[in-house]
Amino acid sequence: MTSTTHPQAAAPAASTSLAGKTVVVVGGKSGIGFGVAQAARAAGATAVVASRRLSSPQERPDLAGFQQVSLDIRDESSVRAAFDAIGVFDHLVVTAAPDLGTWGAFMDADMSGARSYMEGKYLGSWACARHGSPHLNAGGTITFLTGGMAVRPKVGFTAVTSAFAAVEALSGSLAIELAPTRVNTIRPGFIDTDMWAFLPAEHRDGLRKKVEETFPARRAGKPE
């Protein structure tokens, strides 16, 4: 995890309790985002899940009890409208990531795939912070999500590494500019979610096998 909080000597101590707070999770309907939303609700917070499409109770009965709002991270007007609709809140967690598009070695990739991922991951995070922060209550926080590839590049993931590094730089900059709002980035390890569905099955299986052989826990992480 990279912590980029800007120290403020005069800032009051922030409460760690989520009881009675409102937590907005962008990308909160699946994967790590849904795990965050579930944990926030269990801790007594109102959890707002933001995603491109609203789901009916018939489609997603597991979303009962969560507030939903439509937000497309690639569309700044959509992001602005979503936060205007949400109103004041306490904590923002941005976990959303776009589909990678074309996956493979750098020399086999094209600019459209790289642009799509950078727009979704980096500029989407930028837009959420830009239009969400005016609605944050005092003592609020912004948390971004990246991954180990920000500092440990792998073949075939040039766009991901570049976008993750950009988000971490954004986090450091905002920690200074938005202080005393706390801004941090979390780098989770390998979490077995649908995020990896874009990979061919043999590559996914290879990743899981490597995790089981090399990680201390001998297993992949789970969102919860």
Locate predicted features.
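N-terminal Rossmann NAD(P)H-binding glycine-rich loop of SDR-like oxidoreductase domains
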Residues: 29, 37-38
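Rossmann-fold cofactor-recognition segment
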Residues: 61-76
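Conserved Rossmann-fold cofactor-binding substructure of NAD(P)-dependent oxidoreductases
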Residues: 74-88
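Hydrophobic structural elements of the Rossmann-like NAD(P)H-binding subdomain
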Residues: 93, 143-145, 183-186, 196
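Catalytic loop of short-chain dehydrogenase/reductase
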Residues: 105-118, 122-123, 127, 141-179, ...
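C-terminal helical subdomain
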Residues: 181, 185, 204-224
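Short beta-loop-alpha junction of Rossmann-like oxidoreductase domains
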Residues: 190-200
